[in-house]
């Protein structure tokens, strides 16, 4: 199986999204866990709300194939690591391997360190690194819950380097993806405040009333569709499957046309 990433814009998706996603690398383990693959088969029956089970927070590594405007663009990897106690880390790396992105050598990395407080994911720090032939930028942010502010340093605009007042439940882009995985239920509306790189945005999502059969490459998933409702002409759609710790597909559309499309091709426990 392979994995593929979108371009810079995907880093601001909640799993966006994605996306997300931007996604990360991990030190190799002595014995890698077995890869989980779902064999293709006949369409799976839709699940009622009572049968839906959101995936628990657990360590994993996932590989995505990414398309940009319908053309293969590169690779994306996402990893969640338990660093001890209530603290976790989520990483994403996107590498451009096709077309213009390959020529420029685009390499995007994001990470968020967070802890779990009464079931809520609270970001502690966040970093974004963008590399390329004519590009090299890094920004690091700290979410200080004692002072109630978040602030970024590095390659950020002056007006985005000021402290931002925090509110309970505030999320980074990568953390928002995990929160959607935790909170999504058939028919449920979800509301989050996104705070990252000196910006604050409201993100509202709606889950479909029931699951649907989704084909991702050679695999078939019984997945719940979750979509953003306040993005205007920028649509973000995720499909979440029972038993899979990460979205099986993330699609971003602009003005009715597909822009970034991430398709899960492999995942494994860490």
What are these regions (language model features)?
Residues 2-12:
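Bacterial N-terminal signal peptides that target proteins for export
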Residues 10, 150-151, 248, 252:
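Short, hydrophobic/proline-enriched secondary-structure or compact coil segments at domain edges
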Residues 19-24:
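N-terminal signal peptide c-region/cleavage motif recognized by signal peptidases
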Residues 26-145, 182-270:
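Acidic, serine/threonine-rich low-complexity disordered tracts
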Residues 132-173:
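Hydrophobic, well-structured mid-protein blocks that either form specific transmembrane helices
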Residues 160-196:
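Short, structured interface segments that constitute the first stable element of a domain
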């Amino acid at each position: 199986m392979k994995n593929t990433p979108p371009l810079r814009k995907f880093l601001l998706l909640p799993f966006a999204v994605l996306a997300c996603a931007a996604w990360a690398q991990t030190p190799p383990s002595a014995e890698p866990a077995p890869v989980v693959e779902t064999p293709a088969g006949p369409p799976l029956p839709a699940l009622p709300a009572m049968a839906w089970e959101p995936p628990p927070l657990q360590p994993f590594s996932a590989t995505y194939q990414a398309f940009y405007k319908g053309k293969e663009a590169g690779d994306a990897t996402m990893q969640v690591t338990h660093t001890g106690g209530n603290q976790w880390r989520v990483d994403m790396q996107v590498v451009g391997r096709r077309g213009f992105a390959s020529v420029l050598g685009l390499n995007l990395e994001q990470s968020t360190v967070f802890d779990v407080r009464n079931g809520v994911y609270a970001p502690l720090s966040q970093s974004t690194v963008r590399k390329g032939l004519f590009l090299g930028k890094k920004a690091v942010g700290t979410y200080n819950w004692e002072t109630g502010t978040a602030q970024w340093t590095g390659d950020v605009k002056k007006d985005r380097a000021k402290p931002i007042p925090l509110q309970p439940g505030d999320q980074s882009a990568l953390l928002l993806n995990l929160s959607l995985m935790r909170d999504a239920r058939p028919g449920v509306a979800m509301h989050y405040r996104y705070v990252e790189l000196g910006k604050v945005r409201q993100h509202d999502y709606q889950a479909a009333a029931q699951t649907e059969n989704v084909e991702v490459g050679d695999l078939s998933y019984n997945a719940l569709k979750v979509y953003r409702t306040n993005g205007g002409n920028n649509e973000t759609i995720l499909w979440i499957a029972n038993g899979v710790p990460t979205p099986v597909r993330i699609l971003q559309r602009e003005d009715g046309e597909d822009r970034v499309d991430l398709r899960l091709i492999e995942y494994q426990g860490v």
